[in-house]
């Protein structure tokens, strides 16, 4: 994606300062010596000018926020470090295809003996980019068309449109994203969408047409998202043999909800971490801003990771949640929690744990799930240092429960009910990390604590996703 160049400067000593981990895109500093060089690496320097080559529709003010720290550098090492950091910030905006940095001695009548000029050579993304692909899954084929307008108004705004035309369903989504200048983590987005989901474990089809607006911002070591969503939901039966409980849920509803999520994440990787912790807490309040659906929903996710000897990693995770209906109406099948499957309590079929009617799983208003995991390198370390590092041997123990609570009873009764009829499983398998995108698991599972009505997957189970218990 580019290189930091230093011109008319002596090469850095081999024992020079450590730049730290500069990211996957960082490259070695390229030094181009010239005649009559002046040794500046150990002297104070002043960044007199910062130039940009290649700017078109990008506004100057948003650029100045990203490169202002370059002027604060006091020596050559700081200039090079802060120039690299500014380059990373510019790339993060998502408006440049390439960013190169050139550091040169200052020229001109106002040039100081220790003055430097920093030049950013940038290549902007095109005004319109597109993608086209096909997807096959769940006995359905679909064509997906995507369009993106990056840097729409010159300040890193982005408009994205995605249209999916399938043999069974058609979906679309339109979104507008705008970051705050100088603070990319503080951003605002608006989404308009229509999406259809099929849930065979419940014999249910759900079509959502909605609009949402959300604001994300960091505070100290946490990140927060505040969101409003208004959605028109249409529920229908997926098959003619759907249970009466599912048929009773069919029809239209309007949900207007306010939600807040807080995340504290110190993990070194979100897909297969070796160290660090994650805490995620979500709250959703529906009905206060309108609609005919009213509830209060709380859930959390906790994960701890510790690297042991011989590149072995121990991981512990805990999920939990509760849904409290408000008013006279019971909770909807579309809002309840579901449990079971290769990404939660392994050894059970997808979302096939807990309350059910005639083979259709109805979800629950309260749940918990926990897991203990041990990840080790492959035996004999094949492909060590290369492709083999993407694989891990996996040993696990999972447990959890899903049920409905009587909110007229006290907390002790709720805890007692959640502690009854615990489903649990253990097993071993292989994990494949697909970069920082997703991970695949192939496990041999032994389900235990099976209750009447649960659907199990005894033996080999395959899972793919980004969020695992």
UniProtKB/Swiss-Prot annotation:
Task: Specify the protein's topology with respect to the membrane.
Answer: Multi-pass membrane protein
Keywords of the record: Cytoplasm, Membrane, Methylation, Mitochondrion, Mitochondrion outer membrane, Transmembrane, Transmembrane beta strand
Q: Which family does it belong to?
A: Belongs to the SAM50/omp85 family.
Its GO biological process annotations read: cristae formation; mitochondrial respiratory chain complex assembly; protein insertion into mitochondrial outer membrane
Gene3D superfamilies in the record:
membrane protein fhac (3.10.20.310), membrane protein fhac: a member of the omp85/tpsb transporter family (2.40.160.50)
Q: What is this protein called?
A: Sorting and assembly machinery component 50 homolog
Q: Name one GO cellular component term.
A: mitochondrial outer membrane
Where does the signal peptide begin and end?
Answer: none
| Residues modified to N6-methyllysine | 255
The parts of the chain that form a coiled coil are none
Which residue ranges traverse the bilayer?
none
Described purpose of this protein according to its UniProt entry: Plays a crucial role in the maintenance of the structure of mitochondrial cristae and the proper assembly of the mitochondrial respiratory chain complexes. Required for the assembly of TOMM40 into the TOM complex.
Q: How is this protein organized at the quaternary level?
A: Associates with the mitochondrial contact site and cristae organizing system (MICOS) complex, composed of at least MICOS10/MIC10, CHCHD3/MIC19, CHCHD6/MIC25, APOOL/MIC27, IMMT/MIC60, APOO/MIC23/MIC26 and QIL1/MIC13. This complex was also known under the names MINOS or MitOS complex. The MICOS complex associates with mitochondrial outer membrane proteins SAMM50, MTX1 and MTX2 (together described as components of the mitochondrial outer membrane sorting assembly machinery (SAM) complex) and DNAJC11, mitochondrial inner membrane protein TMEM11 and with HSPA9.
Q: Enumerate the spans annotated as POTRA domain.
A: 45-125
- Name of the gene this protein is made from: SAMM50
Q: Which superkingdom heads the taxonomic lineage of this protein's source?
A: Eukaryota
Domain comment?
A: Its C-terminal part seems to contain many membrane-spanning sided beta-sheets, that have the potential to adopt a transmembrane beta-barrel type structure.
**InterPro entries named in the record:** Bac_surfAg_D15, D15-like, POTRA
